[in-house]
């Protein structure tokens, strides 16, 4: 139902919104941030941009052609080890949450990733107007001491010609034994105000409430709205979820494959105050809606590979 609604909106949008076509070809640029960490800036033909840091393999920014930021980034975020960056799209791997020996949400989000050039592939496509980068993380010797599992995680970040942000991920078991993991693409959407948004596509699903020891509940039939702290894992959702923002007249559509669950998080006032890397009022400007595989870990045989994909589209209502 959500899907058909959005298709209509998208068609409507192309008729009523003027898209300023800029003749610069799509581009790929590498820069260093103030800590000397490499960032990649992708730009498509239309002028949308995505900025990615090799620290965490993390998308930090996604802007439309008008320069509006679509992802939330905390004003107090730190961009260097050992902290994870509060905003954008941190990758929670190989676990979600803080169970077991591993650090909260695993270690992928605070390790240095590399650009994966094997096999070499073009970074931009002039005829199709998109730009892309392949990122790779393998465990260090230190990581293997804490979590003795050899793996390769690859994420291909693409900014499509029509401005969609696409994350294609692959995890390969490089062990001689089975590999089990959780994964979540924690996505901090930038919103006008938490009281102005609703999420559709999670109605009537079962969820685990992380504020109540992961007890299982069932969601009501209405779209989700927010008036207090939320930290939930919705189980086995359909492949399309939408975040409507009435304040900015913007809709984010999340399409996912291989990622059955959807984690939804907003820390609200009290927890925001307790988080040193989030401004006291900034919880109003963010909502995390994450494509994830949490309830049932993904298990791979030796040499086996898992694939997942997330595609974010932003639609304006006019
Ligand atoms: C551009 O993208 C199209 C569609 O994905 C592909 O068929 C073509 O080979 C690409 N061109 C280059 C130069 O990579």
What are these regions, as identified by a protein language model?
Residues 32-34, 102-161:
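Extended, loop-rich substrate-binding clefts of extracytoplasmic carbohydrate-active enzymes
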Residues 178-180, 184-263:
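Active-site/ligand-binding surface loops and adjacent short beta/alpha elements
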Residues 39-40, 45-105:
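Acidic-aromatic substrate-binding/catalytic surfaces of carbohydrate-active enzymes
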Residues 169-175, 314:
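Asparagine-centered strand-capping/turn motif at beta-strand->loop junctions
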Residues 2-45, 55, 65, 138-144, ...:
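Beta-strand-rich recognition/accessory modules
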Residues 30, 35, 45-51, 157-162, ...:
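N-terminal onset of structured domains
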Residues 46-49, 58, 67-69, 149-151, ...:
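Short acidic/polar mixed-charge low-complexity motifs
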Residues 40, 50, 133-135, 153-155, ...:
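Hydrophobic residues positioned within well-ordered beta-strands of beta-sheet architectures
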